[in-house]
């Protein structure tokens, strides 16, 4: 169920190779696939011979934006990361929702967004459809655009010219710093991190002194 890399002349190594999907059939709850020759078929007949290049994990634009500010001992450094124009195969969404193991706790989407009866327009296939897991199809390829606050640092530098009590402590200078990593994240794709590696923000404080 994971797209495998292919090495074909004229194609990028970052291309995503999957079988084209036309979505979930409202009548049967099965996924409708499009074969390489243009013929429609069901997910039961998925074949590696029908995979085609759809999407590219290499973004068209990516980079960092950095800025610094200082004023009377105060200072700040901030860094942003951007990435636009690429695609991603949402493997975690496939594993944890579409092909969820019902022996364990599952995401609510396993039942709420899944086909249940004829006429349903659903995002995910009928539950345990013929005992087969969903293979690699274009249904799980998503446009990925990201703008992220990578790091933020705010500090105050004290010396004998701007902070009088520094000399009373026998110091020539001191610096208090607050750092924050991944302080915000925006993406067109909801991050499916699972339970093993939950998202976390990092905060640190630092004090540097000079005598």
Residue ranges of model-derived segments:
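Flexible, surface-exposed loop regions and adjacent strand-edge segments
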Residues: 1-5, 93-103, 108, 189-199
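Conserved small-residue
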Residues: 1-57
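Extracytoplasmic gating/loop element in the C-terminal half of outer-membrane beta-barrel translocons
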Residues: 9-11, 26, 83-170, 174, ...
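Transmembrane beta-barrel strands of outer-membrane/channel proteins
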Residues: 69, 78-82, 176-182, 209
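Strand-connecting loop/turn motifs
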Residues: 71-74, 171-173, 200-202
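Repeated loop/turn-to-beta-strand initiation elements of outer-membrane beta-barrel proteins
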Residues: 73-78, 161-162, 203
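Outer-membrane beta-barrel "beta-signal"
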Residues: 152, 199-211
């Amino acid at each position: 169920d994971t797209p495998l890399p292919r090495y074909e002349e004229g194609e990028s190594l970052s291309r995503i190779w999957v079988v084209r999907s036309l979505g979930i059939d409202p009548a049967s709850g099965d996924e409708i696939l499009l074969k390489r020759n243009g013929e429609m078929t069901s997910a039961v007949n998925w074949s590696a011979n029908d995979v085609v290049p759809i999407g590219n994990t290499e973004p068209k634009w990516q980079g960092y934006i950095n800025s610094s500010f200082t004023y009377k001992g105060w200072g700040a450094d901030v860094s942003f990361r951007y990435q636009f124009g690429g695609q991603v195969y949402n493997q975690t969404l496939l594993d944890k929702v579409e092909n969820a193991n019902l022996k364990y706790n599952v995401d609510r989407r396993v039942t709420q967004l899944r086909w249940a009866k004829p006429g349903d327009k659903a995002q995910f296939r009928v539950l345990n459809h013929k005992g087969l897991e969903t293979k690699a199809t274009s249904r799980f390829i998503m446009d990925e655009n990201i703008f992220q606050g990578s790091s933020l640092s705010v500090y105050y530098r004290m010396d004998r010219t701007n902070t009088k009590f520094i000399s009373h402590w026998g110091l020539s200078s001191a610096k208090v710093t607050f750092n924050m990593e991944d302080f915000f994240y925006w993406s067109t794709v909801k991050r499916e991190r699972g339970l093993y590696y939950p998202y976390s923000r990092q905060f640190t404080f630092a004090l540097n002194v000079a005598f």
